[in-house]
Amino acid sequence: MTFLLGTSNRLLDIKFGLVCLAAALLANEPAAAQSPKIGDPPEASNMRLVGFNDLQGRSAYQPTIHHQGDRWIAYIGHHGGTDAIQKPMNPMTGQAEFNGTSIVDVTDPAHPVYLRHLPGQEGTYEAGGAQMTRVCDGKDLPKGDPGAVYLLRTFGGAAHEIWNVADPANPKLIARLDGLKDTHKSWWECKTGVAFLVSGVPSWRIRRMTEVYDLSDPAKPVKIREFGLPGQEPGSAGRVPTELHGMISTGPEGNRVYFGYGTNKGGILQIVDRDKLINGPKEPTPDNLRAPVIGEMEMSPLNGAHTTYPLGKMTIPQFANDKFASQRDMVMIVDEALINECQPGEARQMMWFVDATVEAKPMVVASYSVPEASGKFCERGGRFGSHSSNESMAPVFFRKLAFVTWFNAGVRAIDIRDPYHPKEVGYFIPAITAATDKRCIKVNGQDACKVAIQSNNVETDDRGYIYVVDRANTGLHILEVTGPAREITALPAN
């Protein structure tokens, strides 16, 4: 371009050239984040929507999918209501009800049928609802009623409840463990009846710890012991270690329980001998709390250990020809993001892969995080960062694909066949609806709010369907993998 200012025509040529140059430069810049609109399609790659239910516009936490006779039933725990709508309307009863548990028939995943809402504790957000669900058949429990199906759920933060849901549309309360605070993400072994309950026992120095119960006869719960980190127990002094978030047991066959402490900071992975935990000395002294522990791994203070998902022994492709340690014992850890729009106070939360082959000295060997720039997620509203993974160990996906929720980035399908090199192979970001709630940050002392998807927890079933629920009241999305992601599994082509 020649910058000569002799004539008006040349001036016009210069101006036109500058406009073209500016347009070219802008074309190379990432597009500004667009606020989602009602009616926009979902964003997806190698995953597709099969079915949807709005869950009566309730903020949802944990989906548990249970094969019940010839039916498949989803038991979905809910957070408490919002300040604006503390008791959403249940159109089946015509009554406003505090959030609790949604029971949905997903036998036909394309046409889920809402069966029952079971109200939870009065209260909003974390103070109310009934977030957690686990389900066992009575015929599997050593002392259960063979004709019963048992739902273990939290009741707000105050209790754990057991219901008979053999008729899922008409649950019946069987037992209740109350006098607690801050109950949360528990684990129940159906073959033994041993339950690891995330509880807050008032005498302990921490908000959440573990109560181990024998629920082999759900009508007659028997407490086995209390457990936590030394320094959390009654009568201890000094610094109180990071609170518990949850755990996953491999049962008597694997003889391990993997505990995760910390949500978005101060994370600890704890590997525990299950037999010693259940049958060892019960008094919560520092020595007794240490006795069943095989190994611990302290994470960075910047990240938590929300979900600790044991993958077990895996052959690592790059080590396949090694004569020693070609198999590695792997654990997947997922943190939970808590702060909206990537604001100060929290590091980016993500997923981590831990080699626990030497159980006394586990170590992180890989990580994965959704690239923020791929969707300008920090600008979309709500939380951006990981939250939780599926926990099913059914063969259809186990050690092949993991599904991890990323709040406003939806659910991500991660190829974990080589856990030293995980890679994303698909995603699904649901579309917002009229029910989707806003999320706010403070700007100059005032609320600045955006409506955003907040994909919360995810689970899979043995058939290969993926169930993701939304924290921002959007509902339940039932998905399946397609294309290259599906080829990783043994599922038939779709």
Range-by-range predicted roles:
Residues A32-N494:
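Feature marking well-ordered beta-strand scaffolds used for ligand recognition
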Residues M1-D13:
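N-terminal secretory signal peptides that target proteins for export/translocation
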Residues D13-N28:
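Bacterial N-terminal signal peptides
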